[in-house]
Amino acid sequence: GPCPEGSGVADRATCATFTVPKDYDDPSSGTIELTMSKIPASGQKKGVVAGNPGGPGGDALGMFSDPSDKGEGSQAVHLPESVGKNYDLIAVEPRGLTWGTPLNCEPEIATPYMTAGMLYGACESHNPGYTKTVNTENTARDLEEARKLLGEKQLNLYGLSYGGPLMSTYATLFPEHTNKAIFDSSASPNDLVFRLAEKRQAIRHEAIHEFFSWV
């Protein structure tokens, strides 16, 4: 069907909403909704390319331009026209984002600042148990659910930036359903986001102390 308004998809793209387990380790936890976009192959279809633009948490629905537009679209990834002739291009919106069951982290009481613990508590207050499931492994498992829905035996993977570790996680979990993989400007799986944030926080802390000692 049609894609959500404002999702930035290519003109020929269509979208579908589907449900997945909220917590794959706990079937009793219920389900969440996700949205997937697809640009169908313009010629004889040979398979499917599944993409993720990185982030983590980057909006994925509109990541692919339509290869038949010869790179004229405003989307982030422009693949060769030959790819668009032979492959459907799909992207699953990562769990927790707008075009699905969103992770609502608005605090009940407005505050000028929030610690990580306060933010986590706000997220949990709206959908208990959901926050901990928004991770790389579950996002990869969500892609596997999309593959099943499409009825495809294998997926070709395209991961940009953090999408590289995400797609490599999928390939590790589901090697029998992985064909070819491209990791474009891939982030290192050793430099996890929180570790990077900790490094940046330490640098900021040092810089602030140097500034005030100078003042």
Predicted feature residues:
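Gly/Pro-rich cap/lid or specificity-loop segments adjacent to the active site
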Residues: G1-V215
